[in-house]
UniProtKB/Swiss-Prot annotation:
EC number: 2.7.7.6
A single Gene Ontology CC term: chloroplast
Keywords: Chloroplast, DNA-directed RNA polymerase, Nucleotidyltransferase, Plastid, Transcription, Transferase
The species this protein was found in: Oryza sativa subsp. indica
Coiled coil regions, renumbered to chain: none
Cross-referenced HAMAP family: RNApol_bact_RpoB
Protein name: DNA-directed RNA polymerase subunit beta
Any GO BP annotation: DNA-templated transcription
Gene coding for it: rpoB
Entries under SUPFAM superfamilies matching the protein: beta and beta-prime subunits of DNA dependent RNA-polymerase
Length: 1075
């Protein structure tokens, strides 16, 4: 945050800054911290020791470019060199050695792992330390407990039982006396009694037998080990027993870490040094003292709020990468120890590099990181749907993951908004569904203190000194500091007009919201958007929307597809430029100079006598199959300055975010076609490519070696295939660039060798060879065919050849998709809908100047959803369109005066009506509404209709990827019923509820057909197709369908035999005919 010369002016921090700061901390501090922990590896038998030094480590530049890493499915990484020393007898060798590769963060704040962009999101966890709580049991008696949480997430509890004895519960089952625990940690009874405030309570409960157990540390350790490990009998104290207890309990559950030590000192008023990161007897005694005070002293009821951000910490990318580096060094230690043993067996002289060079050792580092990025829940595939998603993804915070909560067990309180989130975590932006409230997004001004893991928010300090100097100092407050300040909300900006000392303002103090005098205020928020994330800050008039709809809007903006011709919004909030800039989809000039030439692939810039080539992204596929493309925006010969936009990316216009289109909308019902959130659109949106988007799909095939040792072959010479299917292949058997391909066409021809079957040696095969000259094929055709819905233009073909037999071919196909019935569209206020009908433009309702409307929304979608912001936006958008203006409006403008939003909209509509001389734009009887006409009849509608220009997005949920049909296809081998899912070419299934619905109508014959003949009766389903086509009667089969046979087999597996008997109609005698 930078304070400018202008009073009260500040710049918004970079939105991707959090990821970059985290990675820089890992490189500068995390690597050194873990290398310092690396132990000296000694082999006393051979007088050898190996050591790594933390100082002077180096990272080389990556050997490949980002683009090559993506295309060739490689990891974008850098080689790490460390100083090492090897002492062998009297010989001392020092060498800088390579210990492996570390993935490097790119300019987007992401990593490229095996060719895929991945990002590590921040995890929010309970801080290590101690937490107290009191709760009532079933008898109404208060139970007091203290929970000690270690740095690794292990928990130990201190509790006082009904007999007023103090116990430490070290796991769910075992509990031990607090005196035994303290003695096992090294304190004797005298030291315990000297260091506590309630010695009489400590002395009241141990009997003579318990006092014997704590006479010495050894006896206490034996007692602790017996209860902790549930071991009976007489144990003898030994060093191995002590080491096992140290490893299983003290190292796992007693390591507080740097943050835990600070929290423990602060909570219990201790002064233990920060470098003592393990639990000490003094900590346990102080914690027990406090627990006794809560139980026996009246008035001490200080339960800890576990959901307060002061009791949480952020595990950023720095912490997670550092943990993995420590894990890799641990594996490296074991590998070096094994290598030392092998060296002496072979009797060769080692060097530091030869101890680390063996293949398995040198790839330990990169394999550890690749496993982490591939399997860790907080490592996600980078969302590249549009520039907004690229900016927002790295700012997510999640309570899920190892050591955190789970979607199924998290309580309502842990999901709820907490007052400490104010200005730190957005109260709106969270996922919908089972993880609601567990994943959030950082507010735009929030920053992470990477040392302590707290989230800080900036405020203006309003002190006497600052008032005299007439300047405002920005202070960053962590969650545990802002409890001591009176914080005024952002709407106190209106106080600049009047006498501030005489006014009262809403403020926050200790999680309560109050109204107090201005002179009592300590700090105030700096920006109206301070409480919201980027997604929430892009919603105009957000203060007029219900929070649930704002949540949907911030999520749906991330699903917007970049359109072929982007258009920036008429009504915005002002953050569009910063969001587009920080997404790095545009090309920004890094230095000033003059443009020499531009084309679709690169821009040549002359600067300080040097010619710089700036490559552009052209039709690159994103992780979500959208098209990433940069278009040059500077003409040849133009002089440019540093920071100027040279080329614009997808979904940006003029350096601003442009996710949708400004279209003319009307809020009215139309023949039921916009019932229940359906949307009626004009064919103009199709024919003029208003909502046309490009999508790129990737198809790949790999050659392999068969079990017989024969290699698969990519070729055009594929026997027994129609020439039509092979028409697009070149002489190598790969589809040509620029070809138009349809469903079923072959993209890459491939033959898999097979052992010749016996049929190739029988007489008929010899006859075929003699007469027709045909050779019996010994290869199986396994070509890459274009699946259903994949039609398009081939724009790129990549050959990746690791060795002569291992070849991978990737084909990229570009699809142009116009908007069609079934596509999903949405506004920026949670108003979403599916296209139900595309009307000819002459049939659409039209305005008084003859302009046909582009979209018709249902007006009933507004009052019940309470997202009135869309009405303000559409009316102001209409005025802006007529006046050729763009508006950037900050939220909560009612802080200046009442009804400020409505006054602004009406005044702009009135101005537009005056300038265009169209009185229908603003009619005082029904402002914002107008009489419009039915395009089919030319008659005016009965009621005036609200019309406006709204910014509508096309979402990635498109009908082309969802629509599916099947006549026949694959069946499940066991049940012989159609398989499930579009990807498997599956079919529909009459489930339980559908059967109930049919039973309700009593349609027995239809039910019988659906559940037997048409479904899983092998013979009948073939015959029923023929009978239906020719209009014959459906044949009746007596044998059971396949699913019934499965039931019989399952009963047999339970030793139950199922038989059936035929009963004669004449005399009802039973004939036992076993099937």
């Amino acid at each position: 945050m930078l304070r400018n010369g202008n009073e009260g002016m500040s710049t918004i921090p970079g939105f991707s800054q959090i990821q970059f700061e985290g990675f820089c901390r890992f490189i500068n501090q995390g690597l050194a911290e873990e290398l310092e922990k690396f132990p000296t590896i000694k082999d006393p038998d051979h007088e050898i020791s190996f050591q790594l030094f933390a100082k002077g480590y180096q990272l080389l530049e990556p050997s490949i470019k980002e683009r090559d890493a993506v295309y060739e499915s490689l990891t974008y990484s850098s080689e790490l060199y460390v100083s090492a020393r090897l002492i062998f007898g009297f010989d001392v060798q020092k060498q800088t050695i390579s210990i492996g590769n570390i993935p490097i963060m790119n300019s987007l704040g992401t990593f490229i792992i095996n060719g895929i962009y991945r990002i590590v999101i921040n995890q929010i966890l309970l801080s290590p330390g101690i937490y107290y709580r009191s709760e009532l049991d079933h008898k109404g008696i208060s139970i007091y407990t203290g929970t000690i949480i270690s740095d690794w997430g292990g928990r130990s509890e201190l509790a006082i039982d009904k007999k007023e004895r103090i116990w430490a519960r070290v796991s769910r089952k075992q509990k031990i006396s607090i005196l035994v625990l303290s003695s096992a940690m090294g304190s004797n009874l005298k030291e315990i009694l000297d260091n506590v405030s309630y010695p009489e309570i400590f002395l009241s409960f141990p009997n003579a037998k318990e006092k014997k157990r704590i006479e010495s540390k050894e006896k206490a350790i034996l007692e602790f080990y017996q209860q902790f490990a549930c071991v009976g009998g007489d144990l003898v104290f030994s060093e191995s027993l002590c080491e096992e207890l140290q490893k299983k309990f003290f190292q796992q559950k007693c390591e507080l870490g740097r943050i835990g030590r600070r929290n423990m000192n602060r909570r219990l008023n201790l002064d233990i040094p920060q470098n003592s990161t393990f639990l000490l007897p003094r900590d346990v005694l102080a914690a027990t003292d406090h627990l006794i005070g809560m139980k026996f002293e009246t008035g001490i009821l200080d339960d800890d709020d576990m959901n307060h951000l002061k009791n949480k910490r952020i595990r950023s990318v720095a912490d997670l990468l550092q943990d993995q580096f420590g894990l890799a060094l641990g594996r490296l230690q074991h590998a070096v120890q094994k290598t030392i043993r092998r060296v002496f067996i072979r009797q060769s002289k080692p060097t530091p590099q030869t101890l680390v060079t063996p293949t398995s050792t040198s790839i330990l580092l990169i394999t550890t990181y690749e496993t982490f990025f591939g399997t860790y829940p907080l490592s996600q595939v980078f969302d590249q749907t549009n520039p907004l998603t690229q900016t927002v993804h790295g700012r997510k915070v999640s309570c899920l993951g190892p050591g955190g909560l789970t979607g199924r067990t998290a309580s309502f309180r842990s999901r709820d908004i907490h007052p400490s989130h104010y200005g730190r975590i957005c109260p709106i932006d969270t996922s919908e569904g089972i993880n609601v409230g567990l994943t959030g997004s950082l507010a735009i001004h929030a920053r992470i203190d990477h040392w302590w893991g707290s989230v800080e928010s900036p405020f203006y300090e309003i002190s006497e000194k600052a008032k005299k100097k007439k300047e405002r100092q920005v202070v960053y407050l962590s969650p545990n500091r802002d409890e001591y300040y009176m914080i005024a909300a952002g709407n106190s900006l209106s106080l600049n007009r009047g006498i501030q000392e005489e006014q009262v303002v809403p403020a926050r103090y200790r999680q309560e919201f109050l109204t107090i005098a201005w002179e009592q205020i300590h700090v105030r928020s700096i920006f109206p958007f301070q409480y919201f994330s980027i997604g929430g800050s892009l919603i105009p008039f957000i203060e007029h929307n219900d929070a649930n709809r704002a949540l949907m809007s911030s999520n749906m903006q991330r699903q917007a597809v970049p359109l072929s011709r982007s258009e920036k919004c008429i009504v915005g909030t002002g953050l569009e430029r910063q969001t587009a800039l920080d997404s790095r989809v545009s090309v920004i000039a890094e230095r000033e100079g003059k443009i020499i030439s531009t084309n679709s692939h690169k821009i040549l810039l002359s600067s300080s006598g040097k010619t710089i080539s700036i490559p552009l992204v052209t039709h690159r596929r994103s992780n979500k199959n959208t098209c990433m493309h940069q278009k040059p925006r500077v003409p040849r010969g133009k002089s440019i300055k540093k920071g100027q936009i040279l080329a614009e990316g997808a979904a940006t216009v003029g350096g601003e975010l442009a996710l949708g289109k400004n279209v003319l909308v009307a809020y009215m019902p139309w023949e039921g076609y916009n019932f229940e959130d359906a949307v009626l659109i004009s064919e103009r949106l199709v024919y003029e490519d208003i909502y046309t988007s490009f999508h790129i799909r990737k198809y790949e095939i790999q050659t392999d070696t068969t079990s017989q040792g024969s290699a698969e072959k990519i070729t055009k010479e594929i026997p027994h295939l129609e020439e039509h299917l092979l028409r697009n292949l070149d002489r190598n058997g790969v589809v040509k660039l620029g070809s138009w391909v349809e469903t079923g066409d072959i993209l890459v021809g491939k033959l898999t060798p097979q052992i010749a079957s016996e049929s190739s040696y029988i007489a008929e095969a010899g006859l075929l060879r003699a007469i027709f000259g045909l050779e019996v094929s010994t290869s199986k055709e396994t070509s890459l065919k274009l699946p259903i819905g994949g039609r398009g233009r081939v724009i790129d073909v990549k050959w990746i050849q690791r060795d002569p037999l291992d070849i991978m071919v990737r084909v990229y196909i570009l699809q142009k998709r116009e908007i069609k019935v079934g596509d999903k569209v949405a506004g920026r206020h949670g108003n979403k809908g599916i296209i139900s009908k595309i009307l000819p433009r002459q049939d659409m309702p039209y305005l008084q100047d003859g302009t046909p409307v582009d979209m018709v929304f249902n007006p009933l979608g507004v009052p019940s959803r309470m997202n009135v912001g869309q009405i303000f936006e559409s009316s102001l958008g209409l005025a802006g369109d007529l006046l050729k203006k763009h508006y950037r409006i900050a939220p909560f403008d009612e802080r200046y005066e009442q009804e400020a939003s409505r006054k602004l909209v009406f005044s702009e509509l009135y101005e537009a009506s005056k300038q265009t001389k169209n009185p229908w734009v603003f009619e005082p009887e029904y402002p914002g509404k107008s009489r419009i006409f039915d395009g089919r009849t030319g008659d005016p509608f009965e009621q005036p209709v609200l019309i406006g220009k709204s910014y509508i997005l096309k979402l990635i949920h498109q009908v082309d990827e969802k629509i599916h049909g099947r006549s026949t296809g694959p069946y499940s081998l066991v049940t012989q019923q159609p398989v499930r899912g579009r990807a498997k070419q599956g079919g529909q299934r009459i489930g339980e509820m559908e059967v109930w619905a049919l039973e309700g109508f009593g349609v027995a014959h239809i039910l019988q057909e659906i559940l037997t003949y048409k479904s899983d009766h092998l013979i009948a389903r073939q015959e029923i197709l023929n009978a239906t086509i020719w209009g014959k009667r459906v044949p009746n089969h007596e044998d059971p369908p396949e699913s019934f046979r499965v039931l019989v087999r399952e009963l047999r597996s339970l030793a139950l035999e199922l038989n059936h008997f035929l009963v004669s109609q004449k005399n009802f005698q039973v004939n036992r005919e076993e099937v």
